[in-house]
A protein has these predicted regions:
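ATP-binding N-lobe of GHMP and related small-molecule kinases
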Residues: 1-85, 89-105, 110-114, 119, ...
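C-terminal nucleotide
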Residues: 6, 11-44, 139-283
Length: 283
């Protein structure tokens, strides 16, 4: 994957308290929740991220004492900019620094990922958390999500500017089709694995393999898998273009990614398609 950090952030104010519960205030929701770290998870979804980070740290041997916390920031909520990962990372940093827990950034990324799995119900990957914790200005991150090896690729398109549009269409991964898409991809992998050994995920699958066993897959499953396989190759081509300073080719690969997300993976929307069409027509 090839994520990058942006100039938006979530900020945490944090201090230990002498009580028996944690008090957490969300500026965005203007709501305070009391957390019992040895009790049930909270009913408010935003508070589950804080609770989950604490639980995942304690699973790894940390002792989390009661605290007071307030957080807010300028990362748009539900806009596809990984506000949940930013919150997990900020909370993780605050706890790690205050209590001297000794977790490194890779461990904090895994803690954030497992928070989503175990306390929010989203079987997410690790890209969003990794981008929040490892992103640097003027670079994108070429990340191998299996080994977690990564490389910072310079990103400085002279004469161009990257513009992020807010479609005003809100979503949450917890209530979106994310888990459905993941299950569809896993179904495709299972078909290929019946014939080809050593296949663990779609990164091990080629387009030829998919075409060979297409008849054993649901048509929708094939489309989902084909998008991922094609996107993996687009990423490699895009990185090669970046290393040459070829931002025209890089932009063409980005256009291909949008097309695949819209038509094959079907996770776009009319509003986003409208904005993409305007971008394509603009020199």
């Amino acid at each position: 994957v090839l994520p990058g950090a942006i100039d938006k952030a979530i900020y945490v104010a944090f201090k230990p308290n002498d009580g028996t519960v944690c008090r957490v205030y969300s500026l965005d929701y203007d709501e305070t929740v009391e957390l019992n770290l040895h009790g049930e998870k909270p009913s408010q979804q935003w508070a589950c991220y804080v609770y989950g980070v604490c639980q995942e740290m304690e699973k790894r041997g940390a002792l989390i004492l009661p605290f007071d916390m307030a957080f807010g920031g300028d990362v748009p909520l539900g806009a596809g900019l990984s506000s949940s990962a930013a919150l997990e990372s900020a909370v993780g940093f605050a706890l790690n620094e205050t209590y001297g827990l000794g977790f490194d950034r890779e461990q904090l990324a895994k803690i954030g990922q497992m928070t989503e799995h175990n306390y929010v119900g989203v079987r997410c990957g690790i890209m969003d958390q990794f981008a929040s914790l490892f992103g640097e200005a003027g670079h994108v991150i070429r990340l191998d999500c299996r080994s977690l090896e990564y490389k910072l690729e310079p990103f400085d398109p002279q004469g161009c500017r990257v513009v992020l549009f807010d479609t005003q269409v809100k979503h949450t991964l917890a209530s979106s089709e994310y888990n459905v898409r993941r299950a569809q991809c896993e179904a495709g992998v299972a078909v290929v694995l019946r014939h080809v050994g050593g296949v663990e995920s779609l990164r091990d699958v080629t387009a030829d393999m998919l075409d060979t066993y297409k008849g054993e897959m649901d048509e929708v499953v094939y489309r989902r898998c084909r998008y991922v396989v094609d996107e993996n190759q687009r990423l490699l081509d895009a990185c090669a273009a970046l290393e040459k300073g070829d931002y025209v080719t890089f932009g063409q690969k980005m256009n291909g990614s949008h097309e695949g997300l819209s038509r094959q993976y079907e996770v776009s929307c009319d509003e986003l398609g409208f904005l993409a069409d305007i971008g394509h027509r603009t020199d």
